Curated annotation (Swiss-Prot):
This is DNA-directed DNA polymerase. Residues 202-704 are annotated as: Polymerase. Mg(2+) 3 binds at D475, D654. Composed of two subunits. One is encoded by the phage and the other is encoded by the host thioredoxin. Interacts with DNA primase/helicase; this interaction is essential for the coordination of DNA unwinding and nucleotide polymerization on duplex DNA. Interacts with the ssDNA-binding protein. Part of the replicase complex that includes the DNA polymerase, thioredoxin, the primase/helicase and the single-stranded DNA binding protein. Residues 262-338 are annotated as: Binding to host TrxA. Gene3D superfamilies: 3.30.70.370, Ribonuclease H-like superfamily/Ribonuclease H, Taq DNA Polymerase, Chain T, domain 4. Keywords: DNA replication, DNA-binding, DNA-directed DNA polymerase, Exonuclease, Host-virus interaction, Hydrolase, Magnesium, Metal-binding, Multifunctional enzyme, Nuclease, Nucleotidyltransferase, Transferase, Viral DNA replication. Belongs to the DNA polymerase type-A family.
């Protein structure tokens, strides 16, 4: 086994120059440094480790070092260089798996000052350097300090333009930290049997003897790095046209909103607490006031006649009277960009907030306001106006104006290369960023069809035929309920699973929760499974918190297997529990449940345990599913990539969107995805049959 790291002049999409590399070899216990002129020798050393059946360890290697070396070898040496996946270990992947609850464990380090605030909860190598006590400074910070001392101006990214010996020193230190991190990770007995020295085994032993989760996360990271490099073909022109349409509607709404809500006066500038006129008790709920020290009704007498009252004193033209408190105010014109203004006008129209920020302010967005209804038609029209404005503003932010807007992320190849963290959530679910492709509006939401249609295989033309590619969209059928049925099966002998596959599960749930409609039941069960609170559940039937609590209670009473499952989870996790001053005090047996692939899935609170179990099961099923689908497609002779037959473009929770060279290939992808899902169910002895649904078409609007 060898541990390595490279430094180059840019991120993957624009990298052109290898600066240096370092290798630590466990067989010799030596560090070897490679400078720019040693690039060929460095590649030779890596290939020699592969030839021995050994392992190469990088931090973030799957996403950067490995593809960067392939690119640079061709660019600088005209050499074909490809490291096989099975020979590569990524400590970033292992860190995210083994320390998925890093934010919980980092609090002590943060308080002690061992970990800087900017590194809190981070899996970056620099953060691990601080945690492990191996940090010798950060190259960028030291480079900027050196420039300051020399009186030179820093330009963003210039520390990577050219090789220097300080860079070489930091490169060595990065490998020191990666080695220390690797050894910490390998010491976790849950994932790596302690009787095996994993630094002294070949790749076959490493993958077969470590926990299954280790292999799954590495395969997923490798595949999703490939997906990110593929990118999602994007119709820039269509979204630019949509932006023009949205901006015009926004202008119209701004005018209407200003006309509707006009202006008002509000307190501003008071410095003293208002006190009760009789008792003198401060009244903090009232606006702050000011008490003038000068001023009156009349000015002071100027002459004898005025003093004797024979002649009136002049009127005091000053605005205030000494000792008479007043509330300073300002004139405010309604500003639709102000959340304070919006929530004020909404509450005046009869809206009652149900969700608040950490600072106590009402949360105001289009989702929160979705179900808001008041009796007064005029006030309802005002609320609807605000709702539409917020929705339009959100679409504009997503598509064009926001920091992470789609138009800002279209690469030169006409594709959006969204980033995926395959294990970003504590449950094992992936998270998405730059931009977040998991938040593209659905086709049923306003402007959703135009948004989804912009993401499509049709926007990629084949390099040989010039024809547009075809899109295959496949999603897991009813995954959440099937996961629930799997875990319930030991308590109901598979009755719930049978109802899902052969009956009408939503009608069954409707009866169990005593809900008025089947649609209510669908909304209820998914809210229930995703941990919705009593208030949210109550809103399903247009009621509040108490009704929501009652619905949950009835559902559990009438579905005893779910109650038994919840109780079983509680018994596994909780030693004892009591409520003190509205807070649950828990004595834990352990704070994790076992995932399908053996991993520890950390639980934040007892009431979230069932939701965590189900979300983790769904995430791991889909993760293994996308891995197996690609594997089966390659086994059938298809090549992954835009220069081949199919290309993964997006994986979002329980669906994959795949670009295909022809309709025939798209059909093969849809059929293979179903085969792969069935394989996953068999592999983990799932107690409810797993299925997929596939659609073929030109873009995401059709294939979702």
């Amino acid at each position: 086994m060898i541990v390595s790291d490279i430094e180059a002049n840019a991120l993957l999409e624009s990298v052109t120059k290898f600066h240096c590399g370092v290798i630590y070899d466990y067989s010799t216990a030596e560090y070897v440094s490679y400078r720019p002129s040693d690039f060929g020798a460095y590649l030779d050393a890596l290939e020699a480790e592969v030839a021995r059946g050994g392992l190469i360890v990088f931090h973030n290697g799957h996403k950067y070092d490995v593809p960067a070396l392939t690119k640079l070898a061709k660019l600088q040496l005209n050499r074909e260089f490809h490291l096989p996946r099975e020979n590569c270990i990524d400590t970033l992947v292992l860190s995210r798996l083994i320390h998925s609850n890093l934010k919980d464990t980092d609090m002590g380090l943060l308080r002690s000052g061992k970990l800087p605030g900017k590194r809190f909860g981070s899996h970056a190598l620099e953060a691990w350097g601080y945690r492990l006590g191996e940090m010798k400074g950060e190259y960028k910070d030291d480079f900027k300090r050196m420039l300051e001392e020399q009186g030179e101006e820093y330009v963003d990214g210039m520390e990577w333009w050219n090789f220097n010996e300080e860079m070489m020193d930091y490169n060595v230190q990065d490998v020191v930290v990666t080695k220390a991190l690797l050894e910490k990770l390998l010491s976790d007995k849950h994932y790596f049997p302690p009787e095996i020295d994993f630094t002294d085994v070949g790749y076959t032993t490493f993958w077969s003897e470590s926990l299954e989760a280790v292999d799954i996360e590495h395969r997923a990271a490798w595949l999703l790095a490939k997906q990110e490099r593929n990118g999602f073909p994007f119709d820039t022109k269509a979204i630019e046209e949509l932006y023009v349409e949205l901006a015009a509607r926004r202008s119209e709404l701004l005018r209407k909103l200003t006309e509707t809500f006009g202006s008002w006066y509000q307190p501003k500038g008071g410095t003293e607490m208002f006190c009760h006129p009789r008792t003198g008790k401060p009244l903090p709920k009232y606006p702050r006031i000011k008490t003038p020290k000068v001023g009156g009704i009349f000015k002071k007498p100027k002459n004898k006649a005025q003093r004797e009252g024979r002649e009136p004193c002049e009127l005091d033209t000053r605005e205030y009277v000494a000792g008479a408190p007043y509330t300073p105010v300002e004139h405010v014109v309604f500003n639709p960009s102000s959340r304070d203004h919006i929530q004020k006008k909404l509450q005046e129209a009869g809206w009652v907030p149900t969700k608040y920020t950490d600072k106590g302010a009402p949360v105001v967005d289009d989702e929160v306001l979705e179900g808001v209804r008041v009796d007064d038609p005029e006030k309802q029209a005002a609320i609807d106006l605000i709702k539409e404005y917020l929705m339009i503003q959100k679409r504009i932010g997503q598509s064009a104006e926001g920091d992470k807007a789609w138009l800002r992320y279209v690469a030169e190849d006409g594709k959006i290369h969204g980033s995926v963290n395959p294990n970003g959530a504590v449950t094992g679910r992936a998270t998405h960023a730059f931009p977040n492709l998991a938040q593209i509006p659905g086709v049923r939401s306003p402007y959703g069809e135009q948004c989804r249609a912009a993401f499509g295989a049709e926007h990629h033309l084949d390099g040989i035929t010039g024809k547009p590619w075809v899109q295959a969209g496949i999603d897991a059928s009813g995954l959440e309920l099937r996961c629930l049925a799997h875990f319930m099966a030991r308590f109901d002998n598979g009755e719930y699973a049978h109802e899902i596959l052969n009956g009408d599960i939503h009608t069954k749930n409707q009866i169990a929760a005593e809900l008025p409609t089947r649609d209510n039941a669908k909304t209820f069960i998914y809210g229930f499974l995703y941990g919705a609170g009593d208030e949210k559940i109550g809103q399903i039937v247009g009621a509040g918190k108490e009704r929501g609590k009652e619905l949950k209670k009835k559902f559990l009473e009438n579905t005893p297997a779910i109650a038994a499952l919840r109780e079983s989870i509680q018994q596994t996790l909780v030693e004892s529990s009591q409520w003190v001053a509205g807070e649950q005090q828990v004595k834990w047996k352990r704070r994790w449940i076992k995932g399908l692939d053996g991993r520890k899935v950390h639980v934040r609170s007892p009431h979230a345990a069932l939701n965590t179990l189900l979300q983790s099961a769904g995430a791991l099923i889909c993760k293994l599913w996308i891995i197996k689908t690609e594997e089966m497609l390659v086994e059938k002779g298809l090549k992954h990539g835009w220069d081949g037959d199919f290309a993964y473009m997006a994986w979002v929770h329980d669906e994959i969107q795949v670009g295909c060279r022809t309709e025939e290939i798209a059909q093969v992808v849809i059929e293979t995805a179903q085969e792969a899902m069935r394989w996953v169910g068999d592999h983990w002895n799932f107690r409810c049959l797993l299925d997929t649904e596939g659609k073929m078409g030109p873009n995401w609007a059709i294939c979702h």
